[in-house]
C-alpha cells in the first residue's frame, strides 16, 4: 500500500463512450426523480419487528431517521434501513422498528405526513432490517427540453448501455454539497481530525474510500482509452506521459505482446492479470489468471471486475492490476475494506419520448449501491448530474 498517496483532489469521472453529448435538462426534484427500493425478500408476516414501506419527499434518509426516532421516542440506531436514498427525490424505501412501537407509530402518522413522510404499509417481520438487505433500486427520471433529434440519440444510446454496461462510480451525493467530504475522511484516517459523532465519522471515512475508488476507476478507464486510441507501437509512450502518472508503474511491465493482447479485448473496461473479478450480479470474488477467458465472460455479463474500498480485511488485486491499484490504497484507513463492482448493467430499461412536452421519461433498475446519476452521465456524456 502506498504510504504517500498522490493528491487525488480534483477527480474527473471519465467515461469510455464516444458518443457526442446529448443536450437536455434534468432537475433533481421529487416530481422528476423517483426511487423505489427493490426488496431482497418479502416481509415474513410475523415476528417482533415491523417492516414499514415509507414514501419520503425532499428528505435524506438520515433526516427521515431523525424525524422518525424523535416521533417514536426511540434511538436512531433502533431503526433498521437497507440503504440511503437521495434527498432531492421522491423515495420509496423499507424501514424496520420494534413491534412495541406500533401504537406510537400510529399516533405519529399525522405528524409524519406533515413532514412529507407517508407510511404506506406496516407488516410484521422476524428481524431488524440491515444495511445492504435490498436487491437494488428502480428509478424514474424525467428529462426536459429534449428535441426529437436528441430523443433519437437517447434511444440509441440506451441500447448501447444496455449491452455494454457503465462504470460504477460513486455519485456526487457521496461527497456532500461542496464535494469535499472525503478530505475530512482522510483527515480522520490520519488522526488529524476527531469527531464525537461516530456515525458521521464513519460516513466521512467511507466518502474517502469512495473517492479513492473513483480515482482508481478513472485511471483504469484512461488505460482502456489509451489502448483503444493508439497503435501498438505508440501505447508505451502514451502510458509514460506526464498526463498519466498513475500508469507509469504499469508501463514498466508492458511488453509489445502484452499490449497486443490487451488491445484484442472488446469490452470498454480492459481486464488485467490479477484483477479481482466477481460473479455477476452476485457471487464470490476470484483472481483473474487468464484475461482471454475472463474478458469473454465479462462481455457475456457473467462476471465483472471489482475495485477496492480500501481498509482492513479486504483482498487487494495481484500482478499487473496491483501495479495500478496500489497507488489508490491508504493503509491509514482502519475501517473495514471490501470490493465493489467497477462495472454494472442497468436492467429493464425503458425510454419514452413525449414530443408535445419535449420530455423524455426514463425507467430502469440498478443493482444496490449504484447511482442513477452515474447512469445518466453515461447516457448524456456529461459530468454534471
Swiss-Prot record:
Occurrences of domain TRUD (ranges): 165-305
Entry-linked PROSITE patterns: TRUD, UPF0024
EC numbers for this chain: 5.4.99.27
Catalytic residues (positions): 86
One CC-aspect GO term: cytosol
PANTHER family tied to this protein: TRNA PSEUDOURIDINE SYNTHASE D (PTHR47811:SF1)
Family from the record: Belongs to the pseudouridine synthase TruD family.
Designated name of the protein: tRNA pseudouridine synthase D
Organism of provenance: Helicobacter hepaticus (strain ATCC 51449 / 3B1)
Amino acid at each position: 500500500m502506498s504510504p504517500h498517496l498522490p493528491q487525488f483532489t480534483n477527480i474527473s469521472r471519465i467515461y469510455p463512450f464516444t458518443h457526442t453529448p446529448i443536450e437536455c435538462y434534468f432537475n433533481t426534484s421529487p416530481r422528476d426523480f423517483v426511487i423505489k427500493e427493490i426488496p431482497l425478500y418479502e416481509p415474513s408476516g410475523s415476528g417482533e419487528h415491523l417492516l414499514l414501506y415509507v414514501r419520503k419527499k425532499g428528505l435524506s434518509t438520515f433526516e427521515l431517521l431523525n424525524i422518525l426516532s424523535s416521533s417514536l421516542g426511540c434511538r436512531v440506531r433502533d431503526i433498521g434501513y437497507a440503504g440511503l436514498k437521495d434527498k432531492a427525490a421522491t423515495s420509496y424505501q423499507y424501514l424496520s422498528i420494534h413491534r412495541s412501537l406500533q401504537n406510537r407509530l400510529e399516533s405519529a402518522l399525522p405528524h409524519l405526513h406533515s413532514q412529507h413522510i407517508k407510511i404506506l404499509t406496516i407488516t410484521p417481520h422476524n428481524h431488524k432490517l440491515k444495511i445492504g438487505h435490498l436487491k437494488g433500486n428502480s428509478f424514474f427520471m424525467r428529462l426536459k427540453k429534449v428535441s426529437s433529434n436528441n430523443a433519437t440519440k437517447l434511444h440509441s444510446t440506451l441500447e448501447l448501455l444496455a449491452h455494454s454496461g457503465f462504470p460504477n462510480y460513486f455519485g456526487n451525493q457521496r461527497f456532500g454539497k461542496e464535494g469535499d467530504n472525503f478530505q475530512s475522511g482522510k483527515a480522520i484516517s490520519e488522526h488529524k481530525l476527531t469527531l464525537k459523532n461516530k456515525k458521521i465519522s464513519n460516513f466521512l471515512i467511507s466518502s474517502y474510500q469512495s473517492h479513492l475508488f473513483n480515482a482508481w476507476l478513472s485511471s483504469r478507464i484512461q488505460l482502456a482509452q489509451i489502448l483503444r486510441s493508439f497503435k501498438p507501437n505508440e501505447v508505451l509512450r502514451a502510458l509514460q506521459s506526464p498526463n498519466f502518472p498513475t500508469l507509469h508503474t504499469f508501463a514498466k511491465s508492458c511488453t509489445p505482446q502484452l499490449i497486443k493482447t490487451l488491445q484484442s479485448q472488446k469490452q470498454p473496461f480492459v481486464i488485467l492479470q490479477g484483477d479481482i473479478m466477481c460473479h455477476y450480479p452476485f457471487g464470490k470474488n476470484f483472481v483473474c489468471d487468464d484475461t482471454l477467458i475472463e474478458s469473454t465472460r465479462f462481455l457475456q455479463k457473467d462476471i465483472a471486475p471489482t475495485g477496492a474500498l480500501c481498509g482492513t480485511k479486504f483482498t487487494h488485486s495481484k500482478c499487473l492490476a496491483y501495479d495500478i491499484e496500489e497507488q489508490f490504497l491508504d493503509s491509514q484507513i482502519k475501517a473495514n475494506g471490501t470490493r465493489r463492482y467497477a462495472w454494472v448493467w442497468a436492467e429493464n430499461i425503458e425510454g419514452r419520448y413525449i414530443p408535445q412536452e419535449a420530455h423524455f421519461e426514463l425507467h430502469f433498475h440498478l443493482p444496490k449501491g449504484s447511482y442513477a446519476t452515474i447512469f445518466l452521465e453515461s447516457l448524456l456524456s456529461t459530468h454534471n448530474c
